[in-house]
Amino acid sequence: MFLIMSGAYVGQELESEFGRIPPSFLPLGNRRLFQHQVALAPQGVKVYLSLPESYAVSEIDHQWLEHHQVTIIATPDGLSLGASLVAALNISGHSLNAPLHILYGDTLFNQLPVGDDIVSVSTAKDSYNWAVLTNDEVDWLQDVNTPMSHESQRIIDGYFKFSRPRELVRCITQSEWKFIAGLNRYHKSVGLSAVNSIGWLDFGHVNTYYHSKAEFTTQRAFNELTITAKWIEKSSIKNQKIAAEAYWFDNLPMAMRGFIPQYLGSQNSEGKISYRLEYLYLTALNELFVFSRLPSQIWQKILASAVEFLSLCLEQAVEPNAPINTLDILFSDKTALRLNEFCAARHITLEDQWQFAGQDISLAQIVRDSQKHLPDGKPLLGVLHGDFCFSNILYDFRANKIKTIDPRGMTPDGQKTLYGDIRYDLAKLSHSILGLYDWIIAGYYHVEIANNAIELKIAEQSHHKETQQGFIELIEQTFGLTAKNLYAMQIQLFLSMLPLHADDRRRQDALFANAFRLHQILLRLDQ
């Protein structure tokens, strides 16, 4: 039995950034932490996940857990660690005749230690109230009720394996359901060995969460990304793209630099261009939007900061004769080109009829309807980010301010520029909020396309409806764009991105289907 113990909610600091969720549901690498934890379970061992009884698991998370044969155990709220463990084991109905693996819900490892009757240990890195390893045979493990003053102590870090789980339950029960006291009793009865852990990552506190997340990202970073505790360096074989991003950061007006990480310069080494930014211990909005449970009023503050940035973009004077990204280049021209490419690859035509939600519609009609509602009139020219979507926006909860990364910095024909029509950035922001792009990228959808009939379900949670409506009103008040404008621009974006997702047919199908979903919303706005 492999039990992931996530039967309590995250602490107050983490709750302020991610909402009231169990630790195993925290975001990590655009997935939930439990998806990484389940992968640690030895092959052939049944996996269980304990959760607070009051926590409502979303349908899509339920489906993932069922698909990976993970059994949820709902334990009463407010139990101590020891009582929660005993409750989980009793509720599970497990025979307790086979070895028991226990993993804390806020913990991850590169790999699990090997052995029977073991306690995984690490050296303390931070000053928290850890349980420490001692030389005392009676109290082999001790709870430290005050922050530790030095770093040399070994602490238990969240993985255990017991050969006699029934004896463990007896020991914890006899210790008045105190987990550490129960472990000491088991140590005297059966014996436990301390084993050094391999790649321990702790997500239980806000500081350790961000440090562990940085370490996790570093371990899985592409060759083109170098991450240290202080900076991140980006490079690519696509030199022109990196040079354009560096140009944007290098030339950004001083008034706007509060909205980016500190820019640390670029270099050209043996023909390979790279640049560095300060590494920020913050979460990107795509992970917050999909995986957190933040109330609508927090989202309104986040979006207000994003709009503040875009308003500041609009205030910047455009240099005479500078290349400019115009709306027609970024939408109509690019959409037509990319859509033709997609149709050719799929062996379909723009005039083919598709059925979605009981209506027959062609791609050509969707393009025409969206074209009709694209913003017209005077361009909103200023500094253009060019890819202002949730995955490129970080949020600092302490400062109530966004930080943005990965700008475009050039025109479609390759000219470096800071400038463009910021309505394109509004479209990119909309395609995250209204278009639910990040839910699709995270795999939180169901799509079926057969005989030109399209079915799409995105697992978006209902509490985002208020956030979406607030966003539409905020954009209309600030920039004069209507809901129709926003949906029309998104449709163009989703159609134009289709060839870029050819590496994943199912995801490409979902993005394709989403254009039909957005088109239906656009039609309803017209009625």
Please provide the spans of the model-predicted regions.
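Conserved alpha/beta core of the MobA/IspD/sugar-nucleotide pyrophosphorylase nucleotidyltransferase superfamily
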Residues: 2-6, 96, 153-229
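ATP-binding glycine-rich loop module of kinase domains
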Residues: 220-250, 285-292
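Conserved beta-loop-beta/alpha segment of the NTase-like Rossmann-fold superfamily
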Residues: 61-137
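Conserved kinase catalytic-core helix
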Residues: 288-338, 351, 363-377, 491
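Active-site activation/catalytic loop segments of kinase-like enzymes and analogous catalytic loops
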Residues: 410-474, 491-506
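N-terminal nucleotide-binding beta1-loop-alpha1 segment
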Residues: 1-21
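Conserved core of the sugar-phosphate nucleotidyltransferase
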Residues: 108-186
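Active-site acidic catalytic loop and adjacent metal/ATP-binding pocket
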Residues: 368-420
